[in-house]
Amino acid sequence: MSIKAEEISSIIKQQIENYQSELKVSDVGTVTYIGDGIARAHGLDNAMAGELLEFSNGVMGMAQNLETNDVGIIILGPYTEIREGDEVRRTGKIMEVPVGEALIGRVVNSLGQPVDGLGPIETTGTRPIEAVAPGVMQRQSVNEPLQTGIKAIDALVPIGRGQRELIIGDRQTGKTSVAIDTILNQADQDMICIYVAIGQKESTVRNAVETLRHHGALDYTIVVTAAASQPAPLLYLAPYAGVAMAEEFMYSGKHVLVVYDDLSKQAAAYRELSLLLRRPPGREAYPGDVFYLHSRLLERAAKLNDSLGGGSITALPFVETQAGDISAYIPTNVISITDGQIFLQSDLFFSGVRPAINAGLSVSRVGGSAQIKAMKTVAGTLRLDLAAYRELESFSQFGSDLDAATRAKLERGKRTVEVLKQDLHKPLKVEKQVLILYALVHKYLDDVPVHDVLRFESEMNTWFDHNHPELLEEIRTTKKLPDEAKLEAALKEFKNTFVPSEEK
């Protein structure tokens, strides 16, 4: 077989034409300091703020401080294997997390990696954890209610879809229970829920996950956890990972509820990182940009306008107070960013009023416009009645003789407090909330003994389910009160069957 010279030259020409030079240029620096989840590296002159960097052992870091001589890096993983003198290289990427339907029902860490032992998550989409919040013209005002299933909230401090409502109170006052009950109540509301646990004990997160699983709520919930044992950078990033996952759904026209439990621990983790990076401390040793830390997170909650699909993110951030002091630095910051707050008080909690919501200090600035008409009608004067009762209660402790009108107000107040009590993990549908509040406002409870009020409510709900389901259905579908004559007749009929128990 003879090879012709022309063939050889044409093959060589073809090879030369197809040749592509693949030069790979990478910026490489050297670790000059390592410790406490922080590294400093020299030689990364072109690194960008927030860029992901890779250490020689595969652990990732994030560029935070860009200084003249070196770069301050927070390490997103175990740092004990990294040594001074190790290589660290730029990736040219910023921090992203996986997003999409595949995450629903899973427990993931701040980087979007599964931690529930159920195998890898099959998702191709990712979103950067830092994103620009929707602008003024991309939003619309809050106009749809988010039903929490908690009477004291839906009646006194209603929340709308797209709102930011702070839940604030001391430790062990039932903040997490409020959030879990709200998630449980979204079962038939076409909502996706994201529960972000920041700095919680792993046993606490496990309990929350099992509660959600037991009630079937994991079918529409994503849990993002950065446990107390995790490095501070992961606690700092967890809320941003949660809201990035939520934005994917919001921009697809869906409604999302994000719970941040709690932002005090995120602020403490950020303070730790900032002090280790030698940033100047400010009030309570927090860095100067701790306000921006929370404002850029919570501003990403919005109700989008109809041209963008009308999706929404509702944020329920938690802040833990010390001895009820809501005038500390982080509480006042977050109160000023959010659209209202629900204040949980420990003395109410220990006196048996649960949920321990202080109606006087709690407020919802935009939720009122989202409240359904039926609830507005029955709950209109409730807040004022409750405030008047608290005032009279403190006055009546002096033991002075009270006139009949004052005594009647006190008795009504006791029953109001009793009606607003609720068992754990038993959210109540809005039509049944309207029913008991209607009974309260229209004096059907005035002659029911205080200790029988909750029994009256549960028996009334069962009775209406069996005898007048059409009235409940009418409230649910029209969102207005049914014909008052029918409702009054039904309530009178039930009340005739109710037997008060003996005095305790």
Swiss-Prot record:
It catalyses: ATP + H2O + 4 H(+)(in) = ADP + phosphate + 5 H(+)(out). It comes from the Bacteria. One of its GO terms (cellular component) is plasma membrane. GO terms for molecular function: ADP binding; ATP binding; proton-transporting ATP synthase activity, rotational mechanism. Its main location: membrane. It holds the Pfam family ATP-synt_ab_C. Gene3D superfamilies: 2.40.30.20, ATP synthase alpha/beta chain, C-terminal domain (1.20.150.20), P-loop containing nucleotide triphosphate hydrolases (3.40.50.300). Keywords: ATP synthesis, ATP-binding, Cell membrane, CF(1), Hydrogen ion transport, Ion transport, Membrane, Nucleotide-binding, Translocase, Transport. It is a peripheral membrane protein. ATP binds at G169, D170, R171, Q172, T173, G174, K175, T176. It is found in: Cell membrane. The record marks S362 as: Required for activity. Its EC number is 7.1.2.2. Belongs to the ATPase alpha/beta chains family. Produces ATP from ADP in the presence of a proton gradient across the membrane. The alpha chain is a regulatory subunit. HAMAP family: ATP_synth_alpha_bact (MF_01346). This is ATP synthase subunit alpha 2.
